[in-house]
Regions:
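Acidic, polar-rich low-complexity tracts and alpha-helical solenoid repeat scaffolds
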Residues: 1-169
Length: 169
């Protein structure tokens, strides 16, 4: 844990060099795997979650850059990366929305419908739900029901303001 914490302290912001965050992530994963009975396990898991949030935010910001530049295939790839590598990312509903938007704007409507639907089913209290429903309606695609487990989890989790970057789009 001490080696991992050294990397955590040297981490940059999400939009800067990721090397220390990647090293911290590797050290924390190794510690969690190698020492499952450690009294520091809970602290290591919490730190890993924090490090992965920084890494996910970095990937999300890169995707946002591509989206703003209208390079939709690259944006879609980065949004997918954020969602795949960091499934617990706090901005996953926004990443899903902009992944769907990138696909739609790159003339891939059928695939975009999958991600709009995931916003509604997996993030039922997200600010993106109404936009996702509108997009699905415009495509004549079915609108799914919220997943009851996701709904219960969303109701228990306090809603955080994502700051200025989350409001840019």
């Amino acid at each position: 844990l001490m080696v991992a914490m050294t990397h955590v302290r040297q981490m940059e912001k999400a939009d800067r060099d990721r090397s220390q965050a990647l090293l911290a992530e590797a050290e924390l994963k190794s510690m969690i795997e190698d020492y499952p009975d450690s009294p520091l396990l809970d602290e290591a898991k919490l730190k890993l979650r924090e490090v992965q949030e920084v890494l996910a935010e970095g990937v999300y910001k890169i995707a946002g850059f591509y989206y703003l530049k209208k390079v939709f295939p690259a944006a879609a790839d980065r949004y997918r990366e954020a969602l795949t590598k960091y499934p617990d990312y706090s901005g996953s509903s926004d990443a899903l929305f902009y992944l769907a938007e990138s696909l739609r704007r790159n003339n891939n409507g059928p695939e975009s419908a999958i991600y709009y639907a995931r916003i509604i089913s997996d993030h039922p209290l997200s600010e993106r739900v109404n936009d996702a429903k509108q997009r699905l309606t415009a495509m004549n695609a079915p609108i799914p029901q919220p997943n009851p487990v996701a709904l219960a989890r969303a109701q228990q989790t306090p809603h955080e303001d994502k700051g200025i970057f989350g409001k840019m789009f």
